[in-house]
């Protein structure tokens, strides 16, 4: 089961590569930007699919962490994004700001996650992150977790993606590679796919 990032969807690039390259069934479904609505969607999908592995990408990593009992791979984990959403939430109270954010972050064409930046939705991400991090190894989480973080990820500068944050909560269970936030295909094939096979065989 693949959980896409913000503005992604069922036709996102990485799960499409995985579906073509792997002998396993890869399922990626478009979910709500509202984390409370998405939580219910994820619970139903896990019950239906009974996945052997969950892969989270970027903001989707927080959803992945909340689904216990299944090994996980996190790609470009944006674990600190909710802290920025907290600040953005207050800005959306200014008339016109929500419309500006909606235009700036408008998803690509296709089956993509609709984005609507409202105070109510953005404020929910604080609780969402808190619940996700309860599953960390530091807090007693038992699920196998491995992350892939690109050293050229532009979100490292703002710490939205943070190697330090990841290691604080999950230890050294991560692979650093010379790639960007979007994880180029060569790294999907050379790093992520072997790890998927390793976890599923284990």
Regions found by a protein language model. Give the residues of each.
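Active-site catalytic motif of lipid deacylating hydrolases and related acyltransferases
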Residues: 1-49
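The alpha/beta-hydrolase serine catalytic core
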Residues: 71-73, 77-202
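Residue in the alpha/beta-hydrolase core beta-strand immediately N-terminal to the catalytic nucleophile
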Residues: 52-55, 71-73
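Short loop/helix-cap segments at secondary-structure boundaries that form the rim of catalytic
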Residues: 19, 63-69
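Generic recognition of short, well-ordered alpha-helical segments
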Residues: 13, 37-41, 67, 160, ...
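Gly/Ala-rich beta-loop-alpha elbow adjacent to hydrolase catalytic centers
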Residues: 55-65
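Short hydrophobic segments within beta-strands
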Residues: 2-6, 55, 148-150
């Amino acid at each position: 089961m693949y959980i896409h990032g913000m503005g992604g969807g069922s036709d996102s690039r990485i799960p499409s590569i995985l579906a073509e390259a792997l002998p396993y069934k890869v399922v990626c479904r478009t979910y709500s930007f509202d984390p409370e609505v998405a939580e219910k969607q994820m619970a139903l999908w896990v019950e239906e699919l009974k996945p052997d592995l969950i892969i989270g990408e970027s903001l989707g990593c927080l959803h992945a962490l909340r689904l216990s009992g299944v090994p996980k791979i996190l790609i470009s984990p944006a674990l600190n994004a909710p802290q920025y959403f907290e600040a953005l939430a207050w800005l959306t109270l200014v008339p016109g700001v929500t419309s500006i954010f909606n235009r700036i972050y408008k998803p690509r064409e296709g089956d993509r996650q609709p984005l609507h930046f409202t105070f109510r939705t953005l404020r929910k991400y604080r609780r969402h992150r808190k619940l996700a991090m309860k599953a960390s190894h530091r807090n007693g989480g038992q699920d196998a977790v491995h992350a892939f973080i690109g050293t050229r990820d532009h979100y490292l500068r703002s710490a939205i993606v943070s190697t330090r944050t990841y290691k604080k909560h999950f230890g050294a269970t991560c692979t650093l590679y010379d790639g960007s936030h979007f994880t180029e295909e060569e790294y999907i094939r050379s790093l992520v796919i072997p790890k998927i096979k390793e976890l599923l065989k284990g």
